[in-house]
């Protein structure tokens, strides 16, 4: 095996371990340790990595510890690292339900990269989505007001559009036409306006609008706030509508109060999809509201809201809830092919 091939095997093994740890909701610091090790050796000449492997000095590099060193050594020797084998064998299905819906999905329309508060490059998110069977995805990094999530300024958003355009040339050639759609998760301001100027919104393919602030405001103004956003012709998806948190490191958070019938009627009338958010700590909307949206003839988008590659596999949780509540594949916009979706999202 050449030095280059050995290093590529090691980088791939380290990233795969990170993927399985993310998928299993392991602590972030554990995931980052393997990703950091992958980045460290990927940035070095292959000959140097090989020399350090032979001399036993890999751990002298920043970001390489005994556990990650063991993975690198096994991979460079041509073996599948024992820890990766263990994780692969333990992975299994996240849930046995939702398979029919998951098989119908062609995309994920809500995910984040390292440009905002995600943990991985755009390309890595895209390649993982392709490996999971998707044909396209929407990159929806945060809008500028959400500074805690490193929301993109106008200048950074324009820069990202250029980066995605170049990356798509590469991915479409290498991954059977796989495409990254330009998107945003835009904050719904307190008055229902959007945290992004119209010129930028008009250049995006998919706009997910979400409430991230003043979550405990009274039901009447919250309803008005959400309806105003839904009525905006640029908005395609209403993200995690109740804002609830039911588990996880951030603790729990109650649902925002709003008139669900009014909000879902606005979604139906203005052609805005109700997101079925698949994150385990959200699972939003609750089943009683999801069933109501089904009764009111809404359309849906089943998304992961992934912030890392391993989280892209969580989509099946949303699929399970969709099937439980009577959502059929034809009413889920990310079961549609890319052209049909883009025709639907066009203002």
Write out the residue ranges for each language-model feature.
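Long, highly charged, low-complexity intrinsically disordered interaction regions
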Residues: 1-100
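Charged catalytic cores and adjacent phosphate/nucleic-acid-binding surfaces used
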Residues: 2-6, 81, 85-104, 122, ...
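Ser/Thr-glycine-rich phosphate-binding loops at phosphate-binding pockets of nucleotides
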Residues: 109-115, 136-140
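Short strand->helix junction
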Residues: 114-116, 307-308
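Core AdoMet radical
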Residues: 138-139, 184-186
């Amino acid at each position: 095996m050449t030095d280059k091939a050995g290093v590529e095997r090691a980088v791939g093994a380290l990233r795969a371990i990170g993927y399985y740890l993310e998928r299993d909701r392991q602590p972030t610091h554990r995931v980052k340790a393997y990703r950091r090790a992958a980045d460290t050796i990927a940035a070095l000449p292959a000959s140097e990595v090989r020399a350090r492997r032979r001399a036993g000095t890999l751990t002298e590099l920043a970001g390489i510890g005994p556990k990650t060193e063991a993975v690198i050594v096994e991979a460079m020797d041509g073996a599948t690292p024992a820890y990766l084998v263990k994780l692969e064998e333990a992975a299994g299905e996240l849930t046995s339900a939702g398979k029919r819906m998951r098989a119908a999905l062609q995309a994920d329309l809500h995910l984040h990269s390292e440009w905002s508060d995600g943990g991985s490059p755009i390309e890595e998110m895209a390649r993982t989505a392709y490996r999971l069977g998707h044909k396209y995805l929407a990159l929806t990094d945060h809008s500028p007001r959400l500074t805690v999530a490193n929301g993109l300024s106008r200048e950074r958003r324009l820069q990202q559009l250029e980066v995605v355009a170049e990356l798509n040339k590469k991915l479409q050639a290498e991954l059977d036409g796989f495409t990254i759609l330009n998107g945003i998760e835009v904050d719904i301001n307190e008055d229902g306006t959007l945290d992004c100027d119209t010129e930028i919104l008009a250049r995006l393919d998919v706009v997910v609008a979400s409430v991230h602030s003043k979550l405990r405001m009274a039901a009447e103004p919250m309803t008005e706030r959400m309806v105003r956003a839904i009525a905006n012709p640029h908005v395609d998806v209403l993200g995690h509508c109740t804002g609830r948190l039911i588990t996880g490191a951030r603790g729990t958070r109650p649902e925002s109060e709003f008139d669900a019938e009014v909000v879902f009627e606005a979604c139906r009338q203005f052609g805005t999809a109700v997101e079925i958010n698949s994150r385990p700590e959200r699972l939003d909307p609750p089943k009683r509201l999801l069933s109501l949206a089904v009764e009111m003839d809404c359309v849906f988008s089943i998304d992961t809201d992934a912030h890392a590659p391993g989280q892209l596999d969580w989509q099946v949780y949303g699929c399970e809830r969709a099937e439980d509540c009577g959502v059929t594949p034809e009413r889920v916009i990310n079961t549609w092919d890319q052209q049909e979706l883009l025709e639907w999202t066009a203002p």
